[in-house]
């Protein structure tokens, strides 16, 4: 299947979801555990090892960099993992846990406080980026009025590929833009040696960034385009773009105020 298209039907569905969840006043939060910075999540009740030799829940969400989700009736052993960066509705505060509803995972869960970053009840999500793993493209849209969204960009991209042990797919989900770097320096596989950098990097989950064409050391100057964009998955997990488009996203999309949808 070499025909590439933008899946506007799926994009419309997700925009409707994004509008509908904002109709009622909510306190929004982000699940966070980048590089296990908030502590390795406890083992879920039933787990498996994936192709990378890492523990994952029964739905395939890895333990590494993820957040433990507990049933409302049992805060001893987590049931599932929630993804770093997932948009979450904060429902109720507690002593060690909060009750919250991760938007992509669904349902209400008890989540240890240290994994939840509350971003408040005044935030409005008027900007959304859609990454399509199947068609290898990216689109950005901005809300111009009730039920109205304008397309700001449509571009070819490449997403992460399944290639153990280092490269893996860009995860599906509904994420909040978490941080931005003008240069995201990367290491050579399996080493501590610098491999180069990716320009205009915007991180949304785990180590996955939307970024420009990677520049391999010793080269320092930026590269605008790669003929592989829009073809097949080829990155470690990141979403590779033409560098000028990565800069557009970097300049246009606010941290904690932009939603990134990864769809199939």
What are these regions (language model features)?
Residues 40-65, 223-229:
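Short beta-strand/loop turn elements enriched in aromatics
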Residues 1-27, 184-264:
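Exported/periplasmic cell-wall-interacting domains
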Residues 1-37, 78-117:
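SH3/SH3-like beta-barrel superfamily modules
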Residues 112-221:
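Gly/Pro-biased beta-strand-loop elements
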Residues 72-82, 150:
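SH3/SH3-like (including bacterial SH3b) beta-barrel domains
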Residues 62-74, 237-243:
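Short, structured beta-strand/loop micro-motifs enriched in basic residues and often containing a Trp
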Residues 81-84, 171-172, 255-256:
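Short, flexible surface segments
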């Amino acid at each position: 299947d070499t025909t590439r298209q933008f899946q506007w039907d799926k994009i419309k569905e997700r925009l409707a979801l994004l509008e509908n969840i904002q109709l009622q006043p909510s306190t929004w939060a982000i699940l966070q555990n980048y590089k296990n910075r908030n502590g390795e999540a406890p083992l879920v009740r039933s787990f498996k090892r994936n192709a990378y030799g890492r523990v994952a829940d029964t739905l395939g969400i890895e333990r590494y960099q993820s957040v433990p989700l507990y049933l409302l009736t049992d805060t001893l052993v987590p049931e599932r993992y929630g993804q770093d960066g997932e948009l979450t509705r904060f429902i109720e505060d507690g002593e060690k846990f909060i009750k919250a509803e991760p938007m992509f995972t669904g349902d209400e869960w008890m989540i240890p406080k240290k994994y939840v970053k509350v971003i408040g009840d005044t935030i409005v999500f008027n900007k959304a980026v859609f990454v399509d793993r199947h068609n290898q493209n990216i689109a950005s849209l901005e809300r111009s009025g009730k039920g109205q969204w304008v397309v700001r960009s449509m571009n070819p991209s490449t997403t992460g590929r399944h290639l153990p042990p280092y490269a893996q797919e860009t995860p599906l989900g509904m994420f909040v833009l978490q941080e931005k770097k003008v240069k995201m320096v990367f290491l050579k596989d399996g080493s501590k040696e610098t491999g180069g950098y990716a320009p205009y990097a915007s991180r949304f989950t785990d180590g996955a960034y939307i970024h420009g064409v990677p520049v391999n050391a010793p080269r320092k100057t930026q590269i605008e385009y790669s003929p592989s964009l829009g073809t097949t998955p080829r990155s470690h997990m990141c979403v590779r773009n033409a560098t000028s488009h990565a800069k557009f996203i970097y300049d246009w999309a606010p941290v904690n105020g932009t939603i990134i949808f990864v769809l199939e």
